[in-house]
């Protein structure tokens, strides 16, 4: 069984959904990012979605885009990301690690090398937010060869053909978005129609569904679980907490001015979000 299979079996027994934080690697530095990731797991995160910094993050709103920039200002590289994943995997051998990486990275490194490197580092899945499922065949093939679960996005208003393709191609989980647009708490998740979004995907008997985009409160998490999702992913709300503790101006590197304060704020937020995954 994969780490995702083990996670879903455990959560089903506990009557819970998954809470998955998105955290940018190297934001604002590799060491500080590792402390943030460790805090998230200790606070109750069930799995991780880790970002690899990129200069043109088209799927991300301003909050997450700024985290890409902070990481790049600090000298972030793909090689550094791989080393950070290895460290997280060594510290947390059972936690599923999903990656969010823009498609230029695998093109630059070569698909087979790219997926093999991330598999060897300890990643379980990779989502390329700018690669739609209709263009995904070569990525899925390279992922399968490396033992990585490919993840595709199920858009909120997708056609049945697209949802069928996403359900067939996604392994580990399906990333369903609760509304169209870019990531961010600037536009909160709409809870209207969440059940329809989930039900439309479930018709095709694919992997468990995680809902994301604009999930920023315990109520959003509870609504996602009530709608039939197996979990919820939160990125921008967590990134805002991190940013509020950063000091430094682009293009200079940033640093966390009060790590203990950041850990406290993250723990409170993530604990509340995880508590909201309890099925009623």
Curated annotation (Swiss-Prot):
Entry-linked InterPro entries: Aldolase_TIM, RibuloseP-bd_barrel, Trp_synthase_alpha_AS, Trp_synthase_suA
Pathway linked to the protein: Amino-acid biosynthesis; L-tryptophan biosynthesis; L-tryptophan from chorismate: step 5/5
Keywords on record: Amino-acid biosynthesis, Aromatic amino acid biosynthesis, Lyase, Tryptophan biosynthesis
Pfam family, one: Trp_syntA
UniProt EC number: 4.2.1.20
Cellular component annotations (GO), alphabetically ordered: cytosol
Record has Lyase as a keyword: yes
Origin: domain of life: Bacteria
Active site location: 49 (proton acceptor), 60 (proton acceptor)
Catalytic reactions on record: (1S,2R)-1-C-(indol-3-yl)glycerol 3-phosphate + L-serine = D-glyceraldehyde 3-phosphate + L-tryptophan + H2O
Family in the record: Belongs to the TrpA family.
Quaternary structure note: Tetramer of two alpha and two beta chains.
PANTHER family with a match to the protein in the record: TRYPTOPHAN SYNTHASE ALPHA CHAIN, CHLOROPLASTIC, TRYPTOPHAN SYNTHASE, ALPHA CHAIN
Record function comment: The alpha subunit is responsible for the aldol cleavage of indoleglycerol phosphate to indole and glyceraldehyde 3-phosphate.
Protein name according to UniProt: Tryptophan synthase alpha chain
């Amino acid at each position: 069984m994969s780490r995702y299979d083990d996670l879903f079996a455990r959560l089903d027994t506990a009557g819970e959904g998954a809470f998955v934080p998105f955290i940018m690697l190297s934001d604002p530095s590799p060491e500080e990012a590792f402390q943030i990731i460790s805090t998230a797991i200790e606070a109750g995160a069930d799995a991780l979605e880790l970002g690899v910094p990129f200069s043109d993050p088209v799927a991300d709103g301003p909050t997450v885009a700024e985290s890409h920039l902070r990481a790049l200002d600090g000298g972030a590289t793909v090689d550094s990301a791989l080393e950070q994943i290895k460290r997280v995997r060594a510290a947390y051998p059972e936690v599923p690690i999903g990656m969010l990486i823009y498609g230029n990275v695998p093109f630059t490194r070569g698909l087979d090398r790219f997926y093999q490197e991330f598999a060897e580092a300890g990643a379980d899945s990779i989502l390329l937010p700018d690669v739609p499922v209709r263009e995904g065949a070569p990525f899925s093939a390279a992922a399968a060869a490396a033992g990585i679960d490919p993840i595709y996005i199920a858009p909120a208003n997708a056609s049945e053909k697209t949802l069928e393709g996403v359900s067939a191609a996604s392994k580990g989980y399906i990333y369903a978005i609760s509304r169209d647009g870019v990531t961010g708490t600037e536009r909160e998740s709409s809870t209207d129609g969440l059940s329809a979004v989930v039900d439309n995907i479930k018709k095709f008997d694919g992997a468990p569904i995680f809902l994301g985009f604009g999930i920023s409160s315990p109520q959003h998490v509870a609504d996602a679980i009530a709608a039939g999702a197996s979990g919820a992913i939160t990125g921008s709300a967590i990134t805002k907490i991190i940013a509020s503790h950063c000091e430094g101006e682009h293009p200079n590197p940033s640093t966390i001015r009060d790590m203990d304060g950041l850990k406290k704020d993250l723990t409170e937020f993530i604990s509340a979000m995880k508590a909201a995954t309890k099925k009623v």
